[in-house]
């Protein structure tokens, strides 16, 4: 595994070569930093989490619990704190962007120019948008920014899966993963839609991190843009030359509980004059929010994946509490009514194999009965263990026997081998990396008998 900390500063205590930036350490700045980096209070260990583009002055506690300022030695990282008075143009729909330009007296063509530069070229600096007049650069910069989420950490697995820990303007975090195709030089970007998750599926690590908030459209589409930054895929390449060829909305959170922001983000991603990902290359996964499934299909027309994982209400109630609200009968009816579902665009049923819970031959036959008449295919996912999980992974013989029953009935039912397991990027393993680190740090401090009152 390769681990890379991005924007890692060297710590300098008061004095020394920090004098040149002391003026930045005003009370207003400190209050803003406390909002952005609440987890950094009281611990030098979290200094590496400061992303490029944020001010790198933080408040740290000395041994006698007196607050003092520490500075990053890299001047390039000592920049102005985020200006909340400026509107981020990323995440605005075309109509919203046109309205913003109209508010400053500009015609719709200005919005079209900006759209091209932001989403086709990946540009964030107005001064480098050469088709826009120089006189306009300053006017735009006074009111607007083009900003992606900050990258706190990038992890690369032995199998080339890549995971980014992203930090948003308010200090909250989510994870984004690039999953390479096993056979081709391309892959999918798995994006998150919530900080934490509304649901509490018992087999899923993300479900142990309760919902904090929904992500905005900017924070959702921004994840794909961060991935493109990392792989250097700007300007938007032709379909044949794309490594980041697909989007799967399968990260942290339930997308249909944040549908408006998810829809806006995906509409931006699908726009042919920008990022240009075809709807046929986008798959949205839901745990079964029945009332929103039809609207999703009608508005977006993307591929649907359903996190099924059980063939009876009894088992699904146990491992997926959402089933108590939308039981299997209602869920399967919503699947049958999903717009655009056909033999050419089958619904994917995701099925995590849990040893002794849902992995028997009888379960496989019941699954066939459940989807009868539906244009369906299956992804069989051996359970990916995580610390504290209560489930086990079935052996390969059991999993293959399950798959064979489905395939003998004419369905595609590959066994999806875990990708990125060594960096906790596999299915069901996503959870804020820094939250794990803070939990580990808290345990270590407790074991050492050190008070932890300043740790979140």
UniProtKB/Swiss-Prot annotation:
Main location: cytoplasm
GO function terms (MF aspect): 4 iron, 4 sulfur cluster binding; metal ion binding; rRNA (adenine(2503)-C2-)-methyltransferase activity; rRNA binding; tRNA (adenine(37)-C2)-methyltransferase activity; tRNA binding
Domain Radical SAM core positions: 183-416
Cofactor(s) the protein requires to work: [4Fe-4S] cluster
List of residues binding [4Fe-4S] cluster: 197, 201, 204
Biological processes, Gene Ontology terms: rRNA base methylation; tRNA methylation
Binding note for cofactor: Binds 1 [4Fe-4S] cluster. The cluster is coordinated with 3 cysteines and an exchangeable S-adenosyl-L-methionine.
Region spans: Disordered: 1-21
Family: Belongs to the radical SAM superfamily. RlmN family.
Name this polypeptide is given: Dual-specificity RNA methyltransferase RlmN
